[in-house]
Amino acid sequence: MVKKEAELCSKLNKWWITTGYKVLPVSNYCIEAKVSYTRLFNFKSGFKEHQLPTLEAYNTKPMKWKISDLDQISTKHYDMSWTNPVTTKALVAIQWVRRGNKTFYLIEPEAITNVIAQGVKSLTEECAKLIAIYIGQL
């Protein structure tokens, strides 16, 4: 995770506690945070090969992982996590980095996959507005 993605995660966490849980449907959310430094968010360099398929899997089948896999990153609060596609929603949060911009877009990974399948190589902020399920301010 790059520094700006880490900053976006921190801001999204604050947004979730103050606003997000009130405006989004009741669910557990898995969020992949992405930032773009230019007008275009390039899909090939912006996503690792496994990220979109994994996020889509959260929306379609039960998932599990051992928290001990994350021991090197931070203190763990429990040992395992299980998700159910009925109660879990995976989303991509994208923010374009520029002075004063506080807007972020929550987009379903399936929508991004559909855009890629149409031959689009990069996402503009205008396109993000069209496919986002939620547009928020940090």
Q: Predicted segments — roles?
A:
Residues 1-25, 138:
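Acidic-basic catalytic patches of nuclease active cores, encompassing PD-(D/E)XK
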Residues 5-6, 96-138:
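Helix-rich interaction surfaces within compact, conserved domain-sized segments
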Residues 10, 14, 57, 129, ...:
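Charged/polar, solvent-exposed surface patches and flexible loops
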Residues 22-39:
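Conserved catalytic cores of phosphodiester-cleaving nucleases, focusing on short active-site segments
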Residues 26-30, 50, 85-87:
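Short connector loops at helix/strand junctions that flank enzyme active sites
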Residues 36-61:
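Mg2+/Mn2+-dependent nuclease catalytic core
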Residues 56-111:
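Nucleic-acid nuclease catalytic cores
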